[in-house]
Amino acid sequence: MEAYAMHKMAIVAPRKARMTLDLIRGKSVKDARAILNNTNTKSSRLILKVLNSATANAVNNLNLKEEELFVSECFINPGPVLKRIKFGSRTKVDRRDKRTSHITVKVSDGKEA
């Protein structure tokens, strides 16, 4: 059975967060937590929260054992871009794009329903 969790509108660039997400794909939940705890990036902290939420959903809602869970699927979709302005010298104005992401993590025990 499979449980999932999502974090929408996370203010982190999808391209940067995908590099962290590739580290945990297919790993057990215990190993994925260890990897994310030792990775010093903003995206790893956000992904760890989503992983903990997906694990709690599996344990509490589906009565699965935490020791048997692994990360079956995880992906990041780009969210809306927040457009901001940056003032430069000599009255120049540039546009800064703050990219957002939608993070999804699915955990499974490998058994069908």
Residue ranges, per PLM feature:
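Ribosome large-subunit tunnel/peptidyl-transferase-proximal elements
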Residues: 1-76, 98-113
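Short, flexible micro-motifs
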Residues: 29, 66, 82, 91-94
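A short, conserved strand-capping beta-turn/loop at the end of a beta strand
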Residues: 75-88
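C-terminal structural segments of small proteins and small subunits
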Residues: 85-86, 91-102
